[in-house]
């Protein structure tokens, strides 16, 4: 069986069948992971907070999920809030304004110059913030401009991981999401919360989470979802 498998692969390359298959590979890859995602959703419908199935799609639905997490899991305990993909600050400002513990710290990471690579129908440079970091008078907040690959390692060298971490992933891209999760893996503690803003994109955030948990044997348990799992929150177990 192994010999036949190896021979089939060799013949595939020898005949250069990629010329025929490659134009359709993106479609079939997306379809394959959409199926895996559908299976995952069917196995995780009974969550403490969930609006599935809802025909009313609105980004404001994430605010209900945020409030649920803030009330039921965080309970005004001090947190280290790390957001990756701050953009114009909608989520970042919500947490800054609704979580009032004076000992909490808020860290926002973004290029502020748009996507570093193409993402679906969005092109490199889309969703930029005019290359300007956000502004706030709240001294608990700090911002870090650049690729996560450039800013996160240096940040972690002096990061004091003494509080519950709330990690907000709005990186969109598979590469950015996987890099961030793998870099933060040694710092994750039981009880930490990780939110994903685009979890239902099969070959990006969903695939990154799947590969991360399977490679690092980290148990992430879903605790809430909104907008039909587009926004999904996990707790580290």
Spans of features found by a protein language model:
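S-adenosylmethionine/decaboxylated-SAM
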Residues: 40-52, 73-237
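Short, small-residue-biased leader/transition segments that mark boundaries at the very start
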Residues: 1-2
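Class I SAM-dependent methyltransferase Rossmann-like catalytic core
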Residues: 5-82, 87-93
């Amino acid at each position: 069986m192994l010999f036949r498998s190896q021979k089939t692969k060799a013949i595939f390359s020898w005949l250069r069948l990629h010329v025929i298959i490659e134009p359709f590979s993106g479609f079939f890859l997306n379809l394959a992971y959409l199926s895996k995602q559908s299976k995952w959703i069917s196995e995780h419908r009974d969550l403490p907070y969930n609006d599935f199935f809802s025909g009313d799609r609105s980004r404001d639905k994430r605010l209900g999920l945020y409030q649920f997490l803030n009330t039921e899991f965080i309970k005004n305990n001090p947190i280290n809030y790390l957001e990756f993909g701050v953009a114009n600050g909608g989520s970042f400002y919500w947490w800054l304004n609704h979580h009032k513990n004076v000992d909490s710290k808020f860290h926002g990471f973004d290029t502020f110059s748009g996507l570093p690579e193409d993402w679906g129908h969005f092109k490199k440079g889309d969703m930029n913030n005019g290359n300007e970091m956000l502004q706030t008078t709240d001294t608990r907040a700090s911002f870090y401009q650049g690729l996560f690959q450039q800013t996160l390692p240096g940040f972690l060298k002096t990061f004091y991981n003494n509080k519950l971490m709330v990690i907000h992933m709005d990186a969109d891209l598979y590469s950015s999401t996987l890099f961030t999760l793998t870099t933060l893996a040694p710092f994750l503690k039981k009880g930490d919360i990780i939110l994903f803003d685009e979890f239902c994109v099969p070959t990006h955030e969903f695939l990154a989470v799947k590969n991360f948990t399977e490679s690092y044997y980290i148990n992430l348990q879903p605790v809430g979802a909104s907008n039909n799992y587009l926004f999904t929150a996990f707790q580290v177990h």
